[in-house]
């Protein structure tokens, strides 16, 4: 069975308040190092920036686990996932902790429809490291909001890439939001999708 591999944050949901709360927690935690962090963030991911400041990813996970995940069930997402699960193996791949991944999926109402999920705790390095995409096979579909982090390696492996939100010439398809996914799948030549 072919898989759809989803990024989580800013792909399956968009919640500005949660994003702001997480960033505030990081800045408060860093204290006087926050200015260097902001400078590093211009070129590196959150985790890489923290690593360059001498913090382990476990610090980040513990910090994020304390932020309340203020999401509600998403009926449109639930309906879409139920339909897609009939034809695809549903996988979520995220850089956040296992707790945050599971809690987010539960709150959105799609945890039971996800066959597998992988968190930042499952790999030595974070996306976009190649090791994080060991589950991606040629012909799988990968959906994410950041081409470099979520889709570049899968595309190199022969996956079909769908970018959510951003403009990017290298993705196979682009959608404005996750709810447009089904309309794109109709144009992908997949023998198992009608």
Task: Describe each model-derived feature in a short phrase.
Residues 1-4, 82, 96-194:
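Asp-based, Mg2+/Mn2+-dependent phosphohydrolase catalytic module
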Residues 2-79, 97-99:
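N-terminal helical cap/lid subdomain that shapes the substrate entry/recognition surface
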Residues 13, 37, 64, 88, ...:
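A general structural-boundary detector
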Residues 14, 92-94, 163:
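Hydrophobic residues in well-ordered beta-strands that form the structural core
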Residues 19-20, 24-31, 37-40, 51, ...:
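Alpha-helix C-terminal capping segments
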Residues 40, 50, 67, 91, ...:
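Short, flexible active-site loop motifs that bind/organize anionic cofactors or intermediates
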Residues 55, 88-89, 110, 159:
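Short phosphate-binding/catalytic loops that engage adenosine nucleotides
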Residues 73, 93, 125:
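Residue-level marker of regulatory loop/turn positions in helix-turn-helix DNA-binding domains and
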């Amino acid at each position: 069975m072919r898989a759809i591999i989803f990024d989580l944050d800013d792909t399956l949901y968009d919640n500005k308040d949660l994003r702001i709360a997480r960033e505030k927690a990081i800045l408060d935690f860093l204290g006087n190092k926050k200015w260097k962090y902001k400078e590093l963030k211009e070129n590196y991911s959150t985790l890489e920036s923290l690593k360059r400041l001498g913090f382990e990813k476990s610090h980040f996970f513990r910090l994020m686990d304390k932020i309340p995940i203020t999401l509600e069930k998403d009926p449109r997402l639930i309906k879409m996932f139920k339909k897609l699960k009939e034809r695809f193996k549903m996988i979520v791949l995220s850089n956040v902790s296992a707790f945050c991944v599971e809690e987010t999926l539960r709150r959105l109402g799609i945890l039971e429809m996800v066959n597998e999920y992988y968190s930042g705790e499952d790999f030595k390095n974070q996306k976009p490291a190649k090791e994080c995409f060991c589950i991606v096979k040629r012909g799988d579909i990968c959906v994410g909001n950041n081409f470099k982090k979520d889709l570049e390696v899968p595309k190199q492996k022969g996956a079909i890439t769908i970018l959510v939100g951003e403009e990017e010439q290298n993705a196979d398809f682009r959608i404005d939001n996750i709810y447009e996914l089904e309309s794109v799948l109709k144009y992908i030549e997949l023998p198992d999708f009608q």
